[in-house]
Swiss-Prot record:
Main location: cytoplasm
Function: Acts as a component of the translation initiation factor 2B (eIF2B) complex, which catalyzes the exchange of GDP for GTP on eukaryotic initiation factor 2 (eIF2) gamma subunit. Its guanine nucleotide exchange factor activity is repressed when bound to eIF2 complex phosphorylated on the alpha subunit, thereby limiting the amount of methionyl-initiator methionine tRNA available to the ribosome and consequently global translation is repressed.
Record organism: Bos taurus
GO cellular component: cytosol; eukaryotic translation initiation factor 2B complex
Entry protein name: Translation initiation factor eIF2B subunit alpha
InterPro entries to which the protein is assigned, alphabetical: eIF2B_alpha/beta/delta, elF-2B_alpha_N, IF-2B-related, IF_2B-like_C, NagB/RpiA_transferase-like
Lineage of the species this protein comes from: Eukaryota, Metazoa, Chordata, Craniata, Vertebrata
Domain of life: Eukaryota
Length: 305
């Protein structure tokens, strides 16, 4: 499976199921790559998979693709020392890969079960951008016969908030789309804030769509709970202390980074994500359980060991 086939397979996975997270599509692609690999050593297989992850990150530069790929590689590689026979070892690696994929496919439902209980009847919720996990949580709240209304930022520059508003309208949830600049104005009207995350970093902070940080700052200033919902495959080995510490490969789209290599100035581009400090986050709802920001590092160590 060469790089062109790898990229085409990845894109076809996303096209088949637009609701699928890009990280899940990447893991499915890596599993298919593992099945088709013709290498003869474990070391060579690991090197090929690492190269494949880098190729996928070049197509989709989101944090989740990077962390999901790395966790997948670690999870399937645990058996590599137990078997001396390569074919048997590869078979076990494929089986473990399928287990990993099944496990992460159930993540959103687990998170929804945990989080929707925090939504009280009559709640006014503020959210940001389009998050499939947040949508699943709100679907669970609707299924539990809870009445609530949602304010959502339009989320420039791609107006993904309007996509979220449309999805919520299908659930018959009252939705109001507000300007990104109106977050401070609307905050006094809401009871809680729920956002997704593109990545959860080692100190319990998050990397998410640009505008999340200002929402968290406003929520903290007005004593509103700020909840984050994210799957565990988004836990990434990164320890930013401020916005400048977030690597450019996560801040900008892959196409933008390629254009920079041809001489375009990155300072003229707008970042797509920002970093939100753990001190601004109330709780994180993950498929590993409900975590405080300080507990994230313990879980991250367990995942990556």
């Amino acid at each position: 499976m060469d790089n062109t086939e790898l990229i085409e397979y990845f894109k076809s996975q996303i096209k088949e199921d637009p609701d699928m997270a890009s990280a899940v599509a990447a893991i499915r692609t890596l599993l298919e790559y593992l099945r088709r690999d013709t290498g003869e050593t474990i070391q060579g297989l690991r090197a090929n998979l690492t190269s494949a992850i880098e190729t996928l990150c070049g197509v989709d530069s989101s944090v989740a693709v990077s962390s999901g790929g790395e966790l997948f590689l670690r999870f399937i590689s645990l058996t590599s020392l137990e078997y001396s026979d390569y074919s048997k070892c590869k078979k076990i690696m494929i089986e473990r890969g399928e287990i990993f994929l099944r496990r992460i496919s159930l993540s959103r439902n687990k998170i929804a079960d945990l989080c929707h209980t925090f939504i009280k009847d009559g709640a006014r919720i503020l959210t940001h951008a389009y998050s499939r996990v947040v949508l699943r949580v709100l679907e669970a709240a609707v299924a539990a016969k809870k009445r609530f209304s949602v304010y959502i930022t339009e989320s420039q520059p791609d107006l993904s908030g309007k996509k979220m508003a449309k999805a919520l309208c299908h659930l018959n949830v009252p939705v109001t789309v507000v300007l990104d600049a109106a977050v401070g104005y609307i905050m006094e009207k809401v009871d809680l804030v729920i956002v997704g995350a593109e990545g959860v970093v080692e100190n319990g902070g998050i990397i998410n769509k640009i505008g999340t940080n200002q929402m968290a700052v406003c929520a903290k200033a007005q004593n509103k709970p700020f909840y984050v919902v994210a799957e565990s495959f988004k836990f990434v080995r990164l320890f930013p202390l401020n916005q400048q510490d977030v690597p450019d490969k996560f801040k900008y789209k892959a196409d933008t980074l390629k254009s920079v290599q041809t001489g375009q100035d990155l300072r003229e581009e707008h970042p797509w994500v920002d970093y939100t400090s753990p001190s601004l986050i109330t709780l994180l709802f993950t498929d590993l359980g409900v975590l405080t920001p300080s507990a994230v590092s313990d879980e991250l160590i367990k995942l990556y060991l």
